[in-house]
């Protein structure tokens, strides 16, 4: 029986010539055409045992592929050009891909040009980017590869600070490619992380590129009323799905988002005032009743800053209150601030540079009902008066934008809506063009380049150009609307001294 001799890494294997003759694969066809009997055919880059497995497949159409031998069989199948075995090996590798081996499989797929494996391993890296940073091979990704990964719309980061920590870890291994930092969008980062990057001597250039990472975009939480029960829904920009988080039966409450939790504050249940505060985790959907406020009240004003929920003013039965207090997320005790100069409810409160500004609302007692234009600022542990609003307004909504305050007024006794800008450094109010009119209740959110207003319709206001954009979207039955980013960055006053500790804590928090 004639044989064909193969030499693999110095080892000899003889193959029945009938197997070679019957083979439809390219390598063996060429052997049939050109092989001289007495010559040993040298095969380079192939494992001896993998070649034996391929011969078994050609004889019996069966092959034993495991996670331990799949790579060497796949290499042999690619070199010898046995497409069915290539497909079986690729399927095995894709089936067994995970966060601990996806970078190795990614590199393997590039080396041998295996598109399906490349796509699957890239997808695994994108879905597990925070985990794969612990792989020693992570630092060997090229600048272009990491840019592609972190620019993917579905990369699994939920805040731009996470992207920053991933980049800083990679830059530590690739100090000549620090300009990769320019893929960051500073407006989505916390002040602490921006300060940390500046202290490292890195500069993020201003970019006009669109934001591609869906996970860092604003999440949305909406409460809609229906037959005395309000439904809470949450929209994730990464999954692009709305999910029902829970329900509440309160009226005249206020709400705010802090550390990925929605707080429902005060209000009334069955026409009775309450001082309880409920919290729902928007990720786990678990509810918790947190420590009660100091008194029963509704129509409070709220704002959040530095991991704390601030509750200001409100209506205690029929009397407006001057009480101001805050609760640190995860704490069990409310801390009282000095009382407001003027008690009020349904006004607006907003933080600018760690100072609280409170404006408008109603001062009421059993004998009085006064619509306010007063503005107060809490700074250096005391309330001081600021320039009043141009008009008296019972309902005010306000947001901070680029260091100033933009206030939009609702309607109760007023005849129209107004838009104002308060220039903080000049203590000065100016009136701006108002696009819509005759709207009572609304919600206002600062969204990077624009301010979003949910009123009788959805509006975008662009402060830099003083222009409006109307979005054709239903806003019926909305009781609460807010946009937020998932901020889990450790709180820290970042200095040269605290920088190493801050970055270490961020890495422990973000990269698993």
Swiss-Prot record:
Record keywords, A-Z: Kelch repeat, Repeat
BACK domain mapped to chain residues: 102-176
SUPFAM superfamilies noted in UniProt: Kelch motif, POZ domain
Any single Pfam family the record assigns to this protein: Kelch_1
The Kelch repeat ranges on this chain: 216-261, 262-307, 309-354, 356-403, 405-449, 452-498
Domain of life: Viruses
Gene3D superfamilies according to UniProt: 1.25.40.420, Kelch-type beta propeller, Potassium Channel Kv1.1, Chain A
Annotated ranges, domain BTB: 2-67
Keyword Repeat found: yes
Family (UniProt): Belongs to the poxviruses Kelch family.
Official protein name in the record: Kelch repeat protein C2
Species, as recorded: Ectromelia virus (strain Moscow)
């Amino acid at each position: 029986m004639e044989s064909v001799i193969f030499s693999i890494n110095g080892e000899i294997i003889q193959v029945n010539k009938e197997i070679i003759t019957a083979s439809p694969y390219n390598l063996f066809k060429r052997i049939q055409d050109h092989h001289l009997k007495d010559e040993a055919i040298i095969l380079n880059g192939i494992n001896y045992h993998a070649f034996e497995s391929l011969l078994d497949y050609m004889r019996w159409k069966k092959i034993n592929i495991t996670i331990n031998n799949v790579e060497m069989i796949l290499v042999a199948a690619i070199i010898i050009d046995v497409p069915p075995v290539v497909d079986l090996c690729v399927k095995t590798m894709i089936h067994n891909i995970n966060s601990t081996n996806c970078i190795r499989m990614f590199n393997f797929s590039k080396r041998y040009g295996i598109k399906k494996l490349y796509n699957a391993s890239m997808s695994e890296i994108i879905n597990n980017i925070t985990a794969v940073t612990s792989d020693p091979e992570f630092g060997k990704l090229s600048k272009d590869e990491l840019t592609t990964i972190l620019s993917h719309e579905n990369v699994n980061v939920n805040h731009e600070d996470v992207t920053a920590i991933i980049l800083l870890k990679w830059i530590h291994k690739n100090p000549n490619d620090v300009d990769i930092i320019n893929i960051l969008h500073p407006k989505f980062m916390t002040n602490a992380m921006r300060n940390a990057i500046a202290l490292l001597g890195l500069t993020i250039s201003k970019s006009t590129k669109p934001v591609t990472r869906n996970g860092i975009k604003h999440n949305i939480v909406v409460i809609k009323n229906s037959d005395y029960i309000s439904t809470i829904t949450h929209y994730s920009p990464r999954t692009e799905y709305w999910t029902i988080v829970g329900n509440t039966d309160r009226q005249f409450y206020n709400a705010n988002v802090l550390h990925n939790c929605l707080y429902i504050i005060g209000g009334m249940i069955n026409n009775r005032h309450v001082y309880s505060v409920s919290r729902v985790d928007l990720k786990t959907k678990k509810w918790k009743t947190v420590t009660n406020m100091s008194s029963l009240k509704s129509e409070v004003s709220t704002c959040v800053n530095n991991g704390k929920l601030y509750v200001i003013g409100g209506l205690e039965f029929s009397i407006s209150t001057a009480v101001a207090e805050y609760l640190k997320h995860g704490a069990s005790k409310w801390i009282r601030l000095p009382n407001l100069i003027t008690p009020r409810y349904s006004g607006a409160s907003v933080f600018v540079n760690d100072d609280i500004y409170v404006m408008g609302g109603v001062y009421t007692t059993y004998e009085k009902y006064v619509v306010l234009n007063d503005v107060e600022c809490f700074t250096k542990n005391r309330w001081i008066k600021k320039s009043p609003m141009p008009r008296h307004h019972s309902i005010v909504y306000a947001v901070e934008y680029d260091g100033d305050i933009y206030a939009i007024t609702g309607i109760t006794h007023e005849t129209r809506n107004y838009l104002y800008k308060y220039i903080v450094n000049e203590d000065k109010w100016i009136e701006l063009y108002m696009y819509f009119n005759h709207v009572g209740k609304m919600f206002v959110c600062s969204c990077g380049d624009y301010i979003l207003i949910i009123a009788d319709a959805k509006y975008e206001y662009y402060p830099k150009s003083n222009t409006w954009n109307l979005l054709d979207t239903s806003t019926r039955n909305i009781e609460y609307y807010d946009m937020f980013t998932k901020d889990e960055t450790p709180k820290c006053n970042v200095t040269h001294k605290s920088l190493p500790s801050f970055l270490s804590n961020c890495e422990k928090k973000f990269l698993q």
